[in-house]
Amino acid sequence: MSILSENNPTQTSITDPNESSHLHNPELNSGTRVASGPGPGPEVESTPLAPPTEVMNTTSANTSSLSLGSPMHEKIKQFDQDEVDTGETNDRTIESGSSDIDDSQQSHNNNNNNNNNESNPESSEADDEKTQGMPPRMPGTFNVKGLHQGDDSDNEKQYTELTKSINKRTSKDSYSPGTLESPGTLNALETNNVSPAVIEEEQHTSSLEDLSLSLQHQNENARLSAPRSAPPQVSTSKTSSFHDMSSVISSSTSVHKIPSNPTSTRGSHLSSYKSTLDPGKPAQAAAPPPPEIDIDNLLTKSELDSETDTLSSATNSPNLLRNDTLQGIPTRDDENIDDSPRQLSQNTSATSRNTSGTSTSTVVKNSRSGTSKLTSTSTAHNQTAAITPIIPSHNKFHQQVINTNSTNSSSSLEPLGVGINSNSSPKNGKKRKSGSKVRGVFSSMFGKNKSTSSSSSSNSGSNSHSQEVNIKISTPFNAKHLAHVGIDDNGSYTGLPIEWERLLSASGITKKEQQQHPQAVMDIVAFYQDTSENPDDAAFKKFHFDNNKSSSSGWSNENTPPATPGGSNSGSGGGGGGAPSSPHRTPPSSIIEKNNVEQKVITPSQSMPTKTESKQSENQHPHEDNATQYTPRTPTSHVQEGQFIPSRPAPKPPSTPLSSMSVSHKTPSSQSLPRSDSQSDIRSSTPKSHQDISPSKIKIRSISSKSLKSMRSRKSGDKFTHIAPAPPPPSLPSIPKSKSHSASLSSQLRPATNGSTTAPIPASAAFGGENNALPRQRINEFKAHRAPPPPPSASPAPPVPPAPPANLLSEQTSEIPQQRTAPSQALADVTAPTNIYEIQQTKYQEAQQKLREKKARELEEIQRLREKNERQNRQQETGQNNADTASGGSNIAPPVPVPNKKPPSGSGGGRDAKQAALIAQKKREEKKRKNLQIIAKLKTICNPGDPNELYVDLVKIGQGASGGVFLAHDVRDKSNIVAIKQMNLEQQPKKELIINEILVMKGSSHPNIVNFIDSYLLKGDLWVIMEYMEGGSLTDIVTHSVMTEGQIGVVCRETLKGLKFLHSKGVIHRDIKSDNILLNMDGNIKITDFGFCAQINEINSKRITMVGTPYWMAPEIVSRKEYGPKVDVWSLGIMIIEMLEGEPPYLNETPLRALYLIATNGTPKLKDPESLSYDIRKFLAWCLQVDFNKRADADELLHDNFITECDDVSSLSPLVKIARLKKMSESD
């Protein structure tokens, strides 16, 4: 006989229908059937039952000698009345259940059942009817109902014989279940010709009755619906059939079963045996009182301790292993095993028997019961050959069964080699314990230890990511759009930066004016940004990224006012809740880097998460234990440096290094971070803590990036951690340069993480290398206030005092001067001294300055190498070198990029950082190439000679924006005085303007344009030799004299002549004003300063760029509209007002308000128009038409009466002399 479980292979059990009336367990699976065997004969169906509420070990019970003639015989008569009905139902199930026989077990079942049928041909319906209602077997007893025809003496004889055969086979456990039969078993079966007892250990009958009853109700439909016509010996599933059970019984009778009736034939009793799980009597609840059975079982088990050891080892017989289908089917013996007080000592034996006799593939998976007292080691069920295995229904058992299942399930399906599953007791016992360990793993994975597992998983996935995890979104390179200003329905501005608001208010533009002309305000603000000398720097200064700030002052400027509205410290856990919030100039991204450092170690007063917890918190939400360390999530919640000065000695470092900075990285843009005095002390005192910190910091890259803003700001500078920017770093390439900084930082940290246990980095190295990298995120972008962090292995870290407070303060200084003490330390921090901090800060700044210089030298070397390569490229392009030389130059031309120049910093920067670094370098190279092109162009324009040989007696007479102005004598003509404009090209922000000026002057030979004589390029300095106008500029005359309308008309006429010439050449001067109108002593007027002039051709007949001086600027330029040559006419009109009133309109206004007034007021109003003639007012009105289409051009104005009736140029000579004398007197 074998057991088949359709739904759950492990939920097979046999019990009496009377016993099943108590328990109704709806959670048990249905479909268990008992078949009499593959051979012909009546079939019996059984219903699976859940285990009783109390289960005891059957390790000793199965082999107990008391099983012969034990209370099983007394219970037989109680169930005879149910034989007929249950037999009919079992017949139906046998037909359907026999189809699930495993192929690997089919032949073995056939052989065993054939032996049973040949020895017991008289199996009859009566036998089935007598055996159907047998009670559950108690521990220490065996189900001898299958052999009920004999008496007790026969049972004892057979028991003795089987015991002998078991002892013989004890040493032959190596027989595998699917190959050979142990000789002892074969001998016992053939010699005794007895059927293996369908032995079932009695246990608490009340529990079995309830379980069987519930299973009968639940599973009757499934059994009736099961296919009846299936062949009895066909099965490919893992479920065990009753034929499998029968084969197990026939092959392992001497192992697990103690046959009670040696005279009965084997086949007849197997076929006539009636399962105790009789589904035919679902309503019967009559059952023997369980208490007596429990007592007997317990007594029996206590008496049979000594016998059990021997017999349990004997039960590891390979005969059971031949039919692995029972290996996982828990019998009622098993359940008694589980509740037995001796389970620990007997578990190994029981497990051995289970693995050898039954397949764990049939172990119950959905059993449920809260009353069982399974231990972790009673995983495998002791599957005796009894055909009454019941369903274990305990949660613990359920988990353990699953584990054992996974361990031993292969034996039930595959005919493994000899000795694979015939394990000895200790070995199987170990398997069982390993199953419980697996259960512990599951519980740790899904239970209360989930944090540990998740943290470990986060560690394993930390380096994948960015990653993350390591997913990073790069910032736009060289993006200049720092603010988007809109206008709402009320006419108010939205998104207007506070700096612009301040600028507008400081410029005198009221809110009312802004609402009246919102678009004009936006235009003039945009113009004001664009017209600054360095637009990028001006834009950054708007956000208080001042390039002129001291680099040694750290990231904090304690006295600087907030640049942006201060955010609240609205962080989870109130990390900085108690400290005041003050906005800081540094960007959120830079503070993010500071957060990475600040949160490295938790305050001892705070709950310190373990390394695992901290790693976990990086991938999960911050731990509530670390609530006080959480970072405020407001991006603008900055804290000034003074608030972070530690005010007490650092507490002793904790015994274990902690890396709990992860909390701050859930809010990467937060900038006010609680930090304890002991954080840096911990890292400085324990080198290993440095490595503990590194993994968390690496995580932050990956994970700490929740918002795109924080990720972008983080990325804004990471790769050039160890390469300082050039002393005057241009802002455009510096943005991508700084972008790669954080990646370089994380890559720098990864080596520390990987080698944390084997090669700890000294605290000083961590101090100088890793910790300093974080605050310096956007250094290259804004000349930020920290030196580039050195590599961890060779950083000239500042000396750290041996005392813990000094170490702490030094570490804090190295990390971030701006640190907010945790609220828990606020009181103590108030009273602590700060002199140590100041000393350490000084030392730190000195060390960082040295480091910056070192890195700057390195960068200079790289740049020199690139210049050399580029020179080689130019030589190749010009054909100066042959093909070989050209190829060599091209090979050298792409030098090792700066990001790759520092591979020691680690490869953890990620693709984004590397790509950013490459793009940044490409932009720098492009700019460098552009500069070289400009220089090359200048070389073609300029004279290659030495100007010192031609011009002598240089006297500096002025300093312009682009260089100094000198007077010199021409060697060829000593009476000829020339003006030399000397400019350092390296300091010129817009070199193309210089070229433009030279080209315009060189190609514009006109009496009213300053003559261009020559130009020289000498050692990087550009010398422009021009005609000298000794009278000075018109500004001197305007400021020192009062001009008549005739004199004004002369200036306008001469200027218009020059403008007409320029406009005819397609050149727009775009900067006509009194400063650019020069006079000589004779009163001749010439236009100069063509730096802002623009070329206009047929294609580009209009210009839209913002150039010029605001007060003389035309409205179309202020409004950023297209414009043409008539902008010079507007400027001429403003210059007329300047000559009339001594100053241009709105000169007393701020430039921004002047632009606003120009854009909104239109034509400026004269102070005293009545004192002017009609001609000049008409001429002025024509020049100052807001609509440039109505504005006159230079040629039209030259024909105006005001110009035609003006004075001669000689009238200006007295004014020039007066202005010169006054100027000289002022200089004296």
Curated annotation (Swiss-Prot):
Localization, UniProt: Cytoplasm; Nucleus
Alphabetical list of SMART domains matching this protein: PBD, S_TKc
Compositional bias per record (Polar residues), positions renumbered to this chain: 1-18, 173-195, 205-222, 232-244, 260-275, 309-328, 368-382, 548-559, 602-611, 627-640, 748-759, 809-824, 875-890
Name of the protein described by the UniProt record: Serine/threonine-protein kinase CST20
Protein family: Belongs to the protein kinase superfamily. STE Ser/Thr protein kinase family. STE20 subfamily.
Sequence positions that bind ATP: I957, G958, Q959, G960, A961, S962, G963, G964, V965, K981
Organism: Candida albicans (strain SC5314 / ATCC MYA-2876) (Yeast)
Listed Gene3D superfamilies: CRIB domain, Phosphorylase Kinase, domain 1, Transferase(Phosphotransferase) domain 1
Keywords, alphabetical: ATP-binding, Cytoplasm, Kinase, Nucleotide-binding, Nucleus, Serine/threonine-protein kinase, Transferase
Any one of the GO CC terms: nucleus
Reaction equations catalysed: L-seryl-[protein] + ATP = O-phospho-L-seryl-[protein] + ADP + H(+); L-threonyl-[protein] + ATP = O-phospho-L-threonyl-[protein] + ADP + H(+)
Entry keyword Nucleus: yes
EC number: 2.7.11.1
Enzyme superclass (EC): transferase
Gene name as annotated: CST20
Pfam family, one: Pkinase
Annotated GO MF terms: ATP binding; protein kinase activity; protein serine kinase activity; protein serine/threonine kinase activity
UniProt domain CRIB: residue ranges: 473-486
